[in-house]
């Protein structure tokens, strides 16, 4: 069962007319669109990806199951315009991921917002064959990068220099980029739970 089919099952089970997806990672997961601005509207009959002019070509190439909307106004205004035009009123949304201000703005008008917190996250918990292969590829890149950096670190290097070498090697091996800030913390900084690389030098 593909990702969109599972979202349509949520729509049916929750008696919704549509689901709005605003979070970056759920938008990317469901549409394959990697741009940093946009929203999805998923209905039983049609799927929309709303973005701005900078990403139209990219969205068209990546999100082939979606109708691409080049927004002319704010993202929320464009969403509401489509919902009104398509006569969609019972709307699922990521209640645990959007701000209060966004909720208030969406809630103006003749729609009913219904939180589907964690429902899309549950879909993402079960990996398909392609996703498993990508995880295995990522793990291999991390292993190879770690072995490489052990041969590169020397006394006097800064944490930032090590970070740069790590990330450069990961890209060389085929990574798109780090999932989060690369953690490099030495000496007394090693106790930090999320030690973002600094100008501290490696000591003996």
Locate predicted features.
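Flexible, acidic/His-enriched mid-domain "rim/lid" segments that flank
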Residues: 4, 45, 77-178, 189
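Basic, ligand-binding patches in group-transfer machinery
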Residues: 184
């Amino acid at each position: 069962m593909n990702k969109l089919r599972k979202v349509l099952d949520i729509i049916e089970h929750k008696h919704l007319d549509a689901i709005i997806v605003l979070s970056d990672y759920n938008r990317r997961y469901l549409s394959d669109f990697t741009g940093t601005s946009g929203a999805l509207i998923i209905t039983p009959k049609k799927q929309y990806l709303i973005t701005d002019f900078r990403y139209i070509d990219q969205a068209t190439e990546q999100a082939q199951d979606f109708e691409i909307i080049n927004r002319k106004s704010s993202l929320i205004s464009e969403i509401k315009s489509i919902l009104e035009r398509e006569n969609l009123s019972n709307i699922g949304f990521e209640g645990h991921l959007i701000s209060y201000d966004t909720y208030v703005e969406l809630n103006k008008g003749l729609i009913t917002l219904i939180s589907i917190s964690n429902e899309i996250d549950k879909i993402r918990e079960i990996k398909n064959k392609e996703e498993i292969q990508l995880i295995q590829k990522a793990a291999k890149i991390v292993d190879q990068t770690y072995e490489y950096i052990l041969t590169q670190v020397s006394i006097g290097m800064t944490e930032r220099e090590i970070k740069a070498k790590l990330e450069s090697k990961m890209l060389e091996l085929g990574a798109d980029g780090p999932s989060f800030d690369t953690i490099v913390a030495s000496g007394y900084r090693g106790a930090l739970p999320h030690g973002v690389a600094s100008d501290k030098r490696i000591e003996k």
